[in-house]
C-alpha cells in the first residue's frame, strides 16, 4: 500500500533484490476496509486487507527499474522547480535593493540587471559611490571580462559618470544585502546546473 515517500526505501530494496513489487493505491484498500466486518485497524487486519485487495485485482502492475528511474527524475524535476522559484524570489529582491541605491543602473544595462557583468560589478561595488571611486582601468576591465568583451572603456566611463550623478541612497545595509543576494543567486545557478546535468 502506498505510503508516499515513507515506503520508497523498502520498494527500492525489494526491486533491487528482484522481488515482484506492486504498490496499491490507498483508495482501493480503503474501500476494502469499509467492506471488512471487523472495523478495528491493526497490522494484521491491514495485511489481510492488502492481500485480499491484491487477489481481487486483474490489472496488477509491478514496479520495474525503469519506474524507479522515473521516480528519481520526477523528484529532481520537483526540486528543480523549487530551486527556480527560490532564485526568482531572490532576483526580485535584488532588483528592489538596487532600485534603492542606484536606480539609474537598470537603464544603462539594456539586457537587465541579471547578467554576469552586473553581478560582478555589484559584488565588488554595490553602491554608486563605490562605483564612482573605482579606477577606470579596473572598472573597464571588470565589465569587459565578465561580458566576454561586450562592454568598452567608453561605456565604463559613462557608467562611472552615471554613478557620480546618482540620486540613490548610500546605504551600507542595503549594499550588504545586494552582495549577499547575488551570492545566493549564483549558488542556486550552480545547483541548477548540477540538477539539470543529473536529469
Q: Where are the language model's segments positioned?
A:
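A detector of single, family-specific signature residues
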Residues: 1-199
Amino acid at each position: 500500500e502506498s505510503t508516499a515517500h515513507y515506503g520508497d526505501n523498502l520498494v527500492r530494496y525489494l526491486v533491487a533484490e528482484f522481488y515482484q513489487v506492486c504498490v496499491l493505491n490507498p483508495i482501493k484498500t480503503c474501500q476494502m476496509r469499509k467492506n471488512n466486518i471487523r472495523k478495528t485497524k491493526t497490522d494484521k487486519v491491514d495485511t489481510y486487507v492488502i492481500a485480499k485487495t491484491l487477489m481481487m485485482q486483474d490489472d496488477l502492475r509491478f514496479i520495474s527499474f525503469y519506474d524507479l528511474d522515473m521516480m528519481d527524475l520526477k523528484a529532481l524535476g520537483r526540486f528543480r522547480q523549487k530551486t527556480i522559484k527560490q532564485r526568482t524570489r531572490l532576483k526580485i529582491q535584488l532588483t528592489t535593493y538596487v532600485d534603492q541605491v542606484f536606480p539609474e543602473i537598470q537603464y544603462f544595462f539594456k539586457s537587465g540587471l541579471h547578467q554576469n557583468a552586473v553581478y560582478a560589478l555589484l559584488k565588488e561595488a554595490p553602491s554608486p559611490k563605490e562605483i564612482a571611486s573605482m579606477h577606470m582601468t579596473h572598472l573597464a576591465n571588470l565589465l569587459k571580462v565578465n561580458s566576454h568583451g561586450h562592454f568598452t572603456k567608453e561605456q565604463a566611463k559613462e557608467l562611472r559618470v552615471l554613478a557620480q550623478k546618482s540620486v540613490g541612497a548610500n546605504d551600507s545595509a542595503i549594499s550588504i544585502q545586494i552582495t549577499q543576494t547575488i551570492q545566493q543567486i549564483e549558488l542556486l545557478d550552480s545547483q541548477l546546473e548540477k540538477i539539470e546535468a543529473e536529469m
